[in-house]
From Swiss-Prot:
InterPro entries: AAA+_ATPase, ATP-dep_Clp_protease_ClpX, ATPase_AAA_core, Clp_ATPase_C, Clp_protease_ATP-bd_su_ClpX, ClpX_bact, P-loop_NTPase, Znf_CppX_C4. Component of the ClpX-ClpP complex. Forms a hexameric ring that, in the presence of ATP, binds to fourteen ClpP subunits assembled into a disk-like structure with a central cavity, resembling the structure of eukaryotic proteasomes. PROSITE patterns: CLPX_ZB (PS51902). GO terms for molecular function: ATP binding; ATP hydrolysis activity; ATP-dependent protein folding chaperone; protein dimerization activity; unfolded protein binding; zinc ion binding. Residues 1-50 form the ClpX-type ZB domain. This is ATP-dependent Clp protease ATP-binding subunit ClpX. It comes from the Bacteria. ATP-dependent specificity component of the Clp protease. It directs the protease to specific substrates. Can perform chaperone functions in the absence of ClpP. Keywords: ATP-binding, Chaperone, Metal-binding, Nucleotide-binding, Zinc. Pfam families: AAA_2, ClpB_D2-small, zf-C4_ClpX. Zn(2+) binds at residues 9, 12, 31, 34. GO terms for cellular component: HslUV protease complex. It comes from Psychrobacter arcticus (strain DSM 17307 / VKM B-2377 / 273-4).
Length: 424
């Protein structure tokens, strides 16, 4: 029995002589054994907390823009393509709503509020296929959506892809690009957007079996299936190559939104064969150039069977349930693209020339001439920058060395005849 003045541990009651160390304070004492016990309890608590933190809840409390809000934001950056914007806005909204629901269900504290019946419903992923001519805005739409939602974005060209084991990029390289875009934050990458362009260029070479392996056509389509529907990709760290005894980064693609796009040149003919009767004789329907529907109008009627005839495999089409067709841009739309969006080309050049202390002006006739040139080149909006760049090359070379240059005027002759812009 300890005497009244013998110091005791305030928690276990042991005397100083019974423990290695007793730390004294004004009103209480604690021994080394109780300190070790408390340390173990805190460590166990931290481990439990870490288990809960493995559940990604980044979308649970995030405000998701409605389809109308997404469409309105797209209008600020992309001209025209109203039908495609609407389809994209709905598909993207449903995709991230699905992500929000799955994260809420994974969070134990929320499960009770949702109910057992709802918890049994599994929402499928709605990947997107964009069909439209070169320069119609497919890539820009995908990039803009990723920026608006603040999610990582990666882009790949389907023509560079080959089956794993062959020279070229394999499908896992696309996931690696997304991981790099998210600074190797796996949870961020798993919620990103991947855009695969030129998907039409990997169509099957034909229905007849071939003795040579089609490693960049149907083979790549087969390889893309798992990525699109959801798989766990093993990615080497920091962009290196895989090798034995290497620790790989596991990335689940189940929640990555996949958007694929292509020009699909000739698809309009496939659709026309399906939708219009053709024949020879007195009662045959004769179609002429004047009354035939435009290619973009036919693309609006695309059906999965048309894509199968074009050369995409049915399994791939089945994993791309959202089809959106973009129309070819006319001259008026190209002029709007030059001037109206937030990052319009004319605004960009005005900013560049402002930094040199000069104000650049494009006449209406100059803008029309730029649009006409782009139409003639059949490059759509993609060709606008090169036309303006060529017209202003000499001016941008000379201007930084000129003193007191205040205005630069670009008129129709500058675009069509290569005349030097007026500088005053």
């Amino acid at each position: 029995m300890a005497e009244d003045n013998t110091p005791l541990c305030s928690f276990c009651g042991k005397e100083k002589s019974e423990v290695k160390q007793l730390i004294a304070a004004d009103d209480a004492n604690i021994c080394n054994e109780c300190i070790e016990l408390c340390t173990d309890l805190i460590a166990d608590s931290d481990e439990n907390t870490d288990d809960d933190s493995d559940i990604d809840t980044s979308w649970v409390n995030k405000k998701l823009p409605t389809p109308k809000e997404l469409r309105a934001k797209l209008d600020e950056y992309v001209i025209g393509q109203d039908a495609a914007k609407k389809a994209l806005a709905v598909a993207v909204y449903n995709h991230y709503k699905r992500l929000k629901v799955s994260q809420t269900l994974a969070n134990d504290s929320k499960k009770a509020k949702i109910g057992a019946a709802d918890a049994m419903v599994e929402l499928a992923k709605s990947n997107i296929l964009l069909i439209g001519p070169t320069g119609s805005g497919k890539t820009l739409l995908a990039q803009t959506l990723a920026r608006l939602l603040d999610v990582p974005f990666a882009m790949a060209d389907a023509t560079t892809l080959t089956e794993a084991g062959y020279v070229g990029e394999d499908v896992e390289n696309i996931v690696q690009k997304l991981l790099q875009a998210s600074d190797y934050d796996v949870s961020k990458a798993e919620q990103g957007i991947i855009y695969i362009d030129e998907i039409d260029k990997i169509s099957k070479k034909g229905d007849n079996p071939s003795i040579t392996r089609d490693v960049s056509g149907e083979g790549v389509q087969q390889a893309l299936l798992k990525l699109i529907e959801g798989t766990v990709a093993a990615i080497p760290p920091h962009g290196g190559r895989k090798h034995p005894q290497q620790e790989l980064i596991q990335v689940d693609t189940s929640n990555i939104l996949i958007i694929v796009g292509g020009a699909f040149a000739g698809l309009d003919k496939v659709i026309q064969q399906r939708t219009e009767k053709t024949g020879i004789g007195f009662n045959a329907d004769v179609s002429s150039k004047d009354d035939s529907r435009r290619s973009s109008e036919l693309l609006q009627q695309v059906e999965p069977e048309d894509l199968i005839k074009f050369g995409l495999i049915p399994e791939l089409i089945g994993r791309l349930p959202v089809l959106a067709a973009l129309t070819e841009l006319d001259e008026d739309a190209l002029v709007q693209i030059l001037t109206e969006p937030k990052n319009a080309l004319v605004k960009q050049y005005k900013y560049l020339f402002d930094m040199e202390g000069a104000d650049i002006t494009f006449t209406k006739e100059a803008l029309d001439a730029i649009a006409k040139k782009a139409m003639a080149r059949k490059t759509g909006a993609r060709g606008l920058r090169s036309i303006v760049e060529n017209a202003l090359l000499e001016t941008m070379y000379e201007l930084p060395s000129m003193k007191n240059a205040k205005t630069v005027l670009v008129d129709e002759q500058v675009i069509n005849e290569g005349k030097t812009p007026e500088i005053a």
